[in-house]
Amino acid sequence: MQIIVVSNFLSKRIEYFIEAGKHLQVEVRFMTYGELFNCLPQLRQAVIKLEPCVSDETNFLKYALLNQAYKETLQRLGEMRLSDDVCFLNTPHALLRALDKKETKQVLMDRGLKVTPMLPSPRSFDELRELLTGCGRGCFLKPRYGSGAGGVMAIRYQPNRNKWVVYTTLQQVDGVI
């Protein structure tokens, strides 16, 4: 049985996964999504671990396009027939569901797991300011769809200085973050 970890590029997380395999004396191979699509019809005796696409994109609009392409890749993989001795460690369908952070959080709460509180979605900065001022803490703003921390913005109000502090990985494009 072979173990294959798949993404568009190697990442530290994937390198750690491969290293863990070596520690267990199990070979773990890396493959790109393109390589997986090419070999999947003939692939036998394999467990496939799908990883999100690696990107250092800071333009939020381009990030959304990358996320859409990843969703389409997962949908395509989910429609392919696999040999009986090939399986996904994390199925394309499960990953598609997990890409919706709001739905995922609701599933976790429904199962009785403790999660960080989720504020209502503000429609303007004034609404966000009101929400944060009322709860007395900072928050992380994330896109609803996507994997990991991409597009995250940390924002906190400092009442003693009457100042808003924002940290982000996003870049300003045409005057808009």
Regions inferred by a protein language model and the residue ranges of each:
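Extreme N-terminal starter segment of soluble prokaryotic enzymes
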Residues: 1-4
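A general, composition-driven signal for non-globular sequence regions
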Residues: 6-7, 136
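Conserved N-proximal alpha/beta basic substrate-recognition cap immediately N-terminal to
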Residues: 8-122, 126
